[in-house]
């Protein structure tokens, strides 16, 4: 018998809900058997209440926990007359007491002993709670299968609606499951469930809740479901929800728990633990009883900055373009022995990469833990078996070896995309890859890749901060610098326009010209460039301050790049990504609110100059494809492509949105062999464009295609113009001198 305290405060486990900024439920966090979301009595449809009472306990309003008439009838018909369809004698309150306090019985005798205890509990529940509260508790507690625990989750899972919107026939279907959810599972047994639904409708007619005509018309209807599988790998914003889960449940970093190669992560986690109130929120905050919040059982409400419409547009853009791009990639690699890897690798190198992937797989770890030898594991990986695999035409069944499946998945190109408001920091869309179910590594905030020419705006910003202007002229010729090892470094240049002529700095950035970039690097300090990149919010400590840094060999995440670019349309103020605005408890009490983090990283003057140059990238330079694909808005941007087309980037912004996209293979040696499809303007830019066309076309979002950047009246970016023509050969930079002036960076 449970103590009085437990009866007065039954222990419910409620799932945490994640909401979009526009009020849509993105998903839940729960244990597999406790995906329950609380709903109050006033938010229940009268149809579900009427169906439940008519079917399970028609005298619910009259008894005090035990229905003597129903109990006597059941005993006589079943115990004496041996009738199988005698009807149940348990009231709704008794059934609730069983759900709350009776474990599953192993045999008939054990179940018989449980019954009297349930009667006593039922009477006490009636004493402590109103009838409405008992009905609410019952419907919140019941397990409707398919990971749909509680009426709110069930209504969404089976009919795609809220409990208050359940139609009569839908409510009857769910109540019909209460007799035996497995037997009357509408997903598996549609006709059987329909028959049970019709029994419930007949009971509702007998109880006077519906007329005979209503019953007949409703019974004639087919059982139609709008089935929504409740799975954290399915639905909208899957990568974002998983990222957010990790942030909310993070523990205080302990260096002993990080391996040597994880020191960068330890560094970032330590910074976040001290400075980010959302990081480890469940660990840092406690409830009234002193215990820490549990993301999976405390029924929290997480209100995020994502807009469900913009998120859908972003996911659609990634899907549409990757599907098309993948066809070109398959065609290029068809017949190549080392595919999907580049021909530049030896077969031994390819085998080593695939072998490493095998050793990192779950199958390998499980077999190794079970004591299998390397030979046994190798044999298992080379044995064909039936499996379902991803394809852009939908999941397909096939037969292949696990080793072949590893190589098969390596063929698929990956992507990362993020979009945010440069003024508020609100992240509006977040896509970490092509399909979370199959490709779970997050390339939006977690993964880092070389950024190529998208780093150039940072160098040009450093130049503006040091007295350059967009109109300064430089001779367009090859420049040679001396690197940190004392060796000459001359960057290659794809741009063959105006060779030998005087060109402006603005022209250099618009055309992503490596020679003009090298010239600026020769006049500046690679250590200062590294420092500026960190100031823009990039936290990778492994950035090497070499002269080649100006071409983007360093690895940065999409999220870091998007945040960094907010400074350009935002008058020099960088805004950190904001993912959550507030957290509430199950009763709607606000537990925490979150505000954007802002930092002035460059002067307003430099921001204006960069804005002018980045607009030229789109209107006059390498980003011109944006215009041809239909985006007419006032905007700036930058393309990026790394060596051998391993990474394709596009960063773009309007006055109200900054968005960035990366596309590439899982491994750097998986890439297009030609620039036709391998450059950033072909791999990443179309995703950005598809997204923006959809966003600007949806007037309900409030983004105006005619919005323009606000520059001072009569602004002239060339007013500080001076002629800085220099030599075509730059003498060695004194690295000893530079290191002496480098200071430790504190983020």
Residue ranges and their predicted role:
Residues 93-95, 173, 418-419, 428-430, ...:
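Structural recognition of the beta-strand scaffold that forms the well-ordered cores
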Residues 12-15, 19-217, 222-270, 282, ...:
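Peptidoglycan glycan-strand catalytic modules in the bacterial/periplasmic cell-wall system
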Residues 91-92, 100-102, 107, 111, ...:
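Active-site-adjacent helix/loop patches that line small-molecule binding or acyl-intermediate pockets
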Residues 1-12:
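Aromatic-capped interface at the extracytoplasmic side
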């Amino acid at each position: 018998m449970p103590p009085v305290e437990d009866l007065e405060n039954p222990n419910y486990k409620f799932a945490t809900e994640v909401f979009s900024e526009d009020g849509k439920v993105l998903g839940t966090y729960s244990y597999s058997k406790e995906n329950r979301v609380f709903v109050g009595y006033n938010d229940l449809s009268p149809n579900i209440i009427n169906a439940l009472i008519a079917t399970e306990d028609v005298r619910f309003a009259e008894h005090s926990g035990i229905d003597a008439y129903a109990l006597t009838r059941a005993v006589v018909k079943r115990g004496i007359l041996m009738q199988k369809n005698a009807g149940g004698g348990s009231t709704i309150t008794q059934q609730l007491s069983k759900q709350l306090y009776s474990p599953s019985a192993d045999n008939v005798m054990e179940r018989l002993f449980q019954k009297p205890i349930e009667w006593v509990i039922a009477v006490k529940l009636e004493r402590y709670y109103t009838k409405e509260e008992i009905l609410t508790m019952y419907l919140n507690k019941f397990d409707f299968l398919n990971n749909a625990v509680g009426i709110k989750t069930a209504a969404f899972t089976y009919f795609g609606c809220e409990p208050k919107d359940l139609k009569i026939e839908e409510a009857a279907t769910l109540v019909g499951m209460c007799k035996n959810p497995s037997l009357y599972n509408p997903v598996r047994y549609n006709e059987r469930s329909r028959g049970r639904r019709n029994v419930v409708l007949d009971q509702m007619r007998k109880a006077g809740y519906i007329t005979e005509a209503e019953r007949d018309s409703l019974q004639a209807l087919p059982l139609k479901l709008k089935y929504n599988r409740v799975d954290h790998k399915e639905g909208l914003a899957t990568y974002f929800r998983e990222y957010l889960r990790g942030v909310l449940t993070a523990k205080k970093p302990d260096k002993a728990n990080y391996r040597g190669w994880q020191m960068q992560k330890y560094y970032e986690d330590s910074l976040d633990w001290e400075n980010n109130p959302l990081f480890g929120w469940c660990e840092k905050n406690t409830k009234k009883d002193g215990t820490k919040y549990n993301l999976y059982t405390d029924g929290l409400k997480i209100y995020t900055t994502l807009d469900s419409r913009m998120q859908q547009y972003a996911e659609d853009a990634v899907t549409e373009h990757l599907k098309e791009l993948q066809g070109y990639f398959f065609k290029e690699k068809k017949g190549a022995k080392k595919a999907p890897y580049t021909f530049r690798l030896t077969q031994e190198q390819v085998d080593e990469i695939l072998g490493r992937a095998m050793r990192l797989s779950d199958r390998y770890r499980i077999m190794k833990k079970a004591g299998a030898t390397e030979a046994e594991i190798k044999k298992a990986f080379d044995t064909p078996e039936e499996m379902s695999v991803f394809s852009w035409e939908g999941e397909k069944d096939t037969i292949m070896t696990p080793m072949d499946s590893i190589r098969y998945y390596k063929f698929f190109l990956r992507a990362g995309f993020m979009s945010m408001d440069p003024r508020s920091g609100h992240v509006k869309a977040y896509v970490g890859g092509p399909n979370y179910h199959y490709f779970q590594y997050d390339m939006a905030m977690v993964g880092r890749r070389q950024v190529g020419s998208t780093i150039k705006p940072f160098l040009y910003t450093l130049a503006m901060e040091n007295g350059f202007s967009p109109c300064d002229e430089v001779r367009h010729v090859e420049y040679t610098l001396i690197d940190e090892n004392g060796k000459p470094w001359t960057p290659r240049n794809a741009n063959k326009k105006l060779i030998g002529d005087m060109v402006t700095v603005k022209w250099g950035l618009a055309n992503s010209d490596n020679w003009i970039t090298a010239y600026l690097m020769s006049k500046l300090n690679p250590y200062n460039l590294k420092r500026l990149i960190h100031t823009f919010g990039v936290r990778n400590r492994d950035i090497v301050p070499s002269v080649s840094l100006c071409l983007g060999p360093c690895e940065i995440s999409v999220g870091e790049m998007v945040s960094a670019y907010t400074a350009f349309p935002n008058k020099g103020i960088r805004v950190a990504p904001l993912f959550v605005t507030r957290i509430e408890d199950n009763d709607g009490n606000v537990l925490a609110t979150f505000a954007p983090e802002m930092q002035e990283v460059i002067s307003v003057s430099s921001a204006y100059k960069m804005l002018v140059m980045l607009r030229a990238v789109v209107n006059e330079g390498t980003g011109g494809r944006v215009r041809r694909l239909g985006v007419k808005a006032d905007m700036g941007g930058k393309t990026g492509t790394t060596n051998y087309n391993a990474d394709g980037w596009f960063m773009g912004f309007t006055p109200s949105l900054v968005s960035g996209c990366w596309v590439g293979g899982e491994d750097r040696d998986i890439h297009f062999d030609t620039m036709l499809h391998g450059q950033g303007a072909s791999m990443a830019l179309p995703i950005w464009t598809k997204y923006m066309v959809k966003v600007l076309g949806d007037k309900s979002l409030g983004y105006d295609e005619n919005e323009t950047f606000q520059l001072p009246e009569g602004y002239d970016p060339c007013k500080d113009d001076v002629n800085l023509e220099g030599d075509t050969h730059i003498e060695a930079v004194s690295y000893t001198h530079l290191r002496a002036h480098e200071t430790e960076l504190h983020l």
